[in-house]
A protein has these predicted regions:
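N-terminal secretory signal peptides
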Residues: 1-63
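Glycine/threonine-rich beta-strand-loop-alpha-helix active-site module
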Residues: 270-296
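Gly/Ser-rich catalytic/binding loops embedded in alpha/beta enzyme cores
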Residues: 72, 76-81, 91-270
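Residue-level signal for the nucleotide or nucleotide-sugar donor/cofactor binding architecture
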Residues: 63, 101, 112, 251, ...
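Twin-arginine (Tat) signal peptide motif
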Residues: 59-69, 82
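Short acidic, glycine/serine/threonine-rich loops at helix termini
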Residues: 184, 224-228, 275-280, 298
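A short helix-breaking turn/cap at a secondary-structure junction
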Residues: 88-91, 162, 287-335
Length: 335
């Protein structure tokens, strides 16, 4: 992850509003995969000379992507989780290693009945509940709605209906994608109570692909900037080092994926708002070709430059997310 500055992000002294949680969710302890240890994140043999320690994550090795990739031996950054868990003193925040490390791994577990969509969703909600106070990656958590979605998707799998590789996969949406019945603030106090009456086209397409939406993520106000700061909702923090910025403007999506609070998410990019969080959080993102993904229901920053796109833990994950997002809107006719 390459950082542009060694300076700590500026934090606002203004009081931060409490995170908005839609519905009451019981986050009782339900150890995911307890009965299926073989489905837990696989171990990877890494040569001792290239193995990364927690100290490496805060040192020069973190600044060189090739070093990171060599240390992971192609395994993906999720495999660092066992080293990071419980390292609060080092300023690091990440989820438990018992959660799937990729969309493909989660999809295999769901189809093998190692766990249900509801169990997977509940596990991620537990992780959010634990790490949100430190990361500030979310503006709104849609816990009850997510569990309801997951139960419906479980019923479909039992009935033999499989929507594809994203069926039951927990993801997040940047808070400038309209979501019916769930507030969309665009990161601004001005829109803090705005509730759209329809989903953005991308939100609809991803729901049709079977994703479970865990909530709406932090962003720079009106997608203006790459700092991850927000005067009203407070600053987001980088899970690799809580004293640093996760980048922006898709700051919450980047931080949530890197911390293992979801398996992927949506962002938008006008001048770097997908690419910067992907780089600063050491995850993967893509800025699709202009017009490849619908912008209907996505709050505009600059009509001629805005692009909607996905972020994920790996190229494979991002490819699956992008496949669900792509598609043109019907042409507009001027009468």
């Amino acid at each position: 992850m390459k950082l542009l500055s060694n300076e700590k992000p500026t934090t606002t002294k203004k009081s931060i509003p409490e995170i908005h949680v839609v519905g009451t969710v019981g986050l009782e302890d339900q150890p995911l995969l307890a009965a299926h240890p073989e489905s837990v994140m696989p171990s990877v043999d890494v040569d001792a000379s290239t193995h990364l320690s927690v100290d490496d994550l805060r040192g020069p090795a973190l600044l060189h992507r090739r070093t990171v990739l060599a240390g992971l031996a192609g395994a993906g950054t999720a495999l660092l989780a066992p080293q990071l868990t419980g390292c609060a003193g080092a300023g690091v925040a990440t989820r438990s290693a018992t959660l799937p490390g990729s969309i493909a791994e989660a999809a295999r577990g769901l189809r093998a009945r190692s766990y249900s969509c509801e169990e997977l969703t509940r596990a991620y909600l537990r992780a959010i509940d634990e790490l949100q106070p430190r990361l500030n990656a979310f503006i709104t958590v849609t816990g009850q709605q997510a569990l309801d979605q997951a139960r419906r998707l479980d019923a479909e799998l039992r009935a033999g209906k499989d929507r594809g590789p994203l069926h039951g996969i927990p993801i997040v949406h940047k808070d400038l994608y309209d979501t019916q019945g769930v507030r969309t603030t665009v990161g601004s106090e001005f829109f803090k109570d705005r509730i759209p009456n329809a989903d953005a086209t991308v939100v609809t397409r991803m729901a049709q692909a079977g994703v479970v939406s865990l909530g709406k993520t932090h962003m720079n106000e009106f997608a203006a900037g790459i700092s991850g700061t927000n005067a009203f909702f407070g600053d987001a923090h980088n899970p690799w080092d809580l004293a640093r910025s996760p980048g922006g403007s898709s700051s919450g999506t980047g931080a949530a994926i890197a911390a293992g609070l979801c398996l992927g998410g949506t962002g938008s990019d006008t001048g770097g708002s997908i690419r910067v969080p992907a780089s600063w959080n050491n995850i993967t993102g893509i800025r699709p070709t202009f017009g490849r993904v619908s912008l209907r229901g996505v709050y505009p920053r600059a009509y001629s430059l805005d692009v909607a796109g996905p972020l994920g833990r790996s190229v494979a994950d991002v490819a699956m997310l992008l496949q669900a997002m792509v598609g043109h809107d019907p042409p507009t006719r001027i009468r």
